[in-house]
């Protein structure tokens, strides 16, 4: 396997270096690139980056043969854009236009790939005979610092502790303010909820009162009707009693009148009899007198 060194700046190395653009590095790996380009000559170095790769040949003839043979080839659904690193394409035209697999192989062989634009054109614009871009910077491991004397270390620790304490206090104050604001909001919400509950209780009480009134009203009406009926019945009874008493009094008065009439008639009869007796007595006296006169005459 070739090395990863593809950033030499000497003219010979630059003229024998091939740039491979629009490469689907999610699918194509370094071993695949070496297998494809090793047939054009010995590969000294190969580096694969995101969207592109570099292949370092021994001489310029092998590099030009690789460019002529592989430029425009489709690998993993993307058309490769290959040229010498020292001689980038000036008039690319529509080099970054996406083309489907159906255009390359016909409508019967349609691959669903999202073609990317030429990473080389977007990221780098090299004039002729310009060194390639530097490789991706590796993470630099910082060297260990020498320990300082105990006093300075203590001061540093104390300073760090003071800074951390200040940060902690500021964060605590911020948290305290946030907590107070949250408490205020919660108290407001609680007050609103309490007022709503009170209003609901009032509404329920009013509804219960109305329901009680609606239930009690027919009973009261019935009681009133029964009382009225009882009073009317008692009045009727009183009227009948009065009528009966009046009729009984009339009968008594009639009987008394009849009795009085009878007494009057009896008194009148007695008076008439007495008068008759009185009339008879003088007649008898006259008769006695007449009889006496007759005797005298004889």
Curated annotation (Swiss-Prot):
Cross-linked residues for Glycyl lysine isopeptide (Lys-Gly) (interchain with G-Cter in SUMO1) are: 225
Which residues are recorded as modified (N-acetylalanine)?
2
Keyword RNA-binding among UniProt keywords: yes
Q: Where in the cell is it found?
A: Nucleus
What is the location of the Glycyl lysine isopeptide (Lys-Gly) (interchain with G-Cter in SUMO) cross-link?
Answer: 243
Its primary localisation, in coarse terms, equals: nucleus
Cite a single GO BP annotation. 3'-UTR-mediated mRNA stabilization
Stretches assigned to coiled coil? 176-211
Record's compositionally biased regions (Basic and acidic residues): 235-246, 270-279
Keywords carried by this UniProt record:
Acetylation, Coiled coil, Isopeptide bond, mRNA processing, mRNA splicing, Nucleus, Phosphoprotein, Ribonucleoprotein, RNA-binding, Spliceosome, Ubl conjugation
Q: Which residues carry this modification: Phosphoserine?
A: 108, 149, 153, 214, 216-217, 226, 231-232, 234, 246, 253, 291, 298
Instruction: State where the record puts the cross-link Glycyl lysine isopeptide (Lys-Gly) (interchain with G-Cter in SUMO2).
Output: 8, 50, 89, 94, 163, 209, 222, 225, 236-237, 243
Where do the segments described as Disordered lie?
A: 131-177, 204-298
Give the compositionally biased regions (Acidic residues).
248-269, 280-298
Spell out the post-translational modification annotation for this entry. Answer: Phosphorylated on Ser-253 and Ser-291 in resting cells.
Xref: InterPro entries: hnRNP_C, Nucleotide-bd_a/b_plait_sf, RBD_domain_sf, RRM_dom, RRM_HNRPC/RALY_subfam
According to its record, what are the GO cellular component terms? actin cytoskeleton; catalytic step 2 spliceosome; cytosol; nucleoplasmic periphery of the nuclear pore complex; nucleus; pronucleus; protein-containing complex; spliceosomal complex
* UniProt GO MF annotations: deaminase binding; enzyme inhibitor activity; identical protein binding; mRNA 3'-UTR binding; mRNA binding; N6-methyladenosine-containing RNA reader activity; poly(U) RNA binding; protein domain specific binding
Q: How does it assemble?
A: Tetramer composed of 3 copies of isoform C1 and 1 copy of isoform C2. Assembly of 3 tetramers with bound pre-mRNA gives rise to a 19S complex that interacts with HNRNPA2B1 tetramers. Component of the 40S hnRNP particle. Identified in the spliceosome C complex. Interacts with IGF2BP1. Interacts with PPIA/CYPA.
Purpose = Binds pre-mRNA and nucleates the assembly of 40S hnRNP particles. Interacts with poly-U tracts in the 3'-UTR or 5'-UTR of mRNA and modulates the stability and the level of translation of bound mRNA molecules. Single HNRNPC tetramers bind 230-240 nucleotides. Trimers of HNRNPC tetramers bind 700 nucleotides. May play a role in the early steps of spliceosome assembly and pre-mRNA splicing.
- Membership in a protein family: Belongs to the RRM HNRPC family. RALY subfamily.
- What protein name does the entry list? Heterogeneous nuclear ribonucleoprotein C
């Amino acid at each position: 396997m070739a090395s990863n060194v593809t950033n030499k700046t000497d003219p010979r190395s630059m003229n024998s270096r091939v740039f491979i653009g629009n490469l689907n590095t999610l699918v194509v790996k370094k071993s695949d690139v070496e297998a494809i380009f090793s047939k054009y000559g010995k590969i000294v170095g190969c580096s694969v980056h995101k969207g592109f790769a570099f292949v370092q040949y021994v001489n310029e003839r092998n590099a030009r043969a690789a460019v002529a043979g592989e430029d425009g080839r489709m690998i993993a659904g993307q058309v490769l854009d290959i040229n010498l690193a020292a001689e980038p394409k000036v008039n690319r035209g529509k080099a970054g236009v996406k083309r489907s697999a159906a255009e390359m192989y016909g409508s019967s062989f349609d691959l669903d790939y999202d073609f990317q634009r030429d990473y080389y054109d977007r990221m780098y614009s090299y004039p002729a005979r310009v060194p390639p871009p530097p490789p991706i910077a590796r993470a630099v491991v910082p060297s260990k610092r020498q320990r300082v004397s105990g006093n300075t270390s203590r001061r540093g620790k104390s300073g760090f502790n003071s800074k951390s304490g200040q940060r902690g206090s500021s964060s605590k104050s911020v948290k305290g303010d946030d907590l107070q604001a949250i408490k205020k909001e919660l108290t407001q919400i609680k007050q609103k909820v309490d007022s709503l509950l009170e209003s609901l209780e009032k509404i329920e009480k009013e509804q219960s009162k109305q329901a009680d009134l609606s239930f009690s009203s027919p009973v009261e009406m019935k009681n009133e009707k029964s009382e009225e009926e009882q009073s009317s019945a008692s009045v009727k009874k009183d009227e009948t009693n009065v009528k009966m008493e009046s009729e009984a009094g009339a009968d008594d008065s009639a009987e008394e009148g009849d009795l009085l009439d009878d007494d009057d008639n009896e008194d009148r009869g007695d008076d008439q009899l007495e008068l008759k007796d009185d009339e008879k007595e003088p007649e008898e006296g006259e008769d006695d007198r007449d009889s006496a006169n007759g005797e005298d005459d004889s």
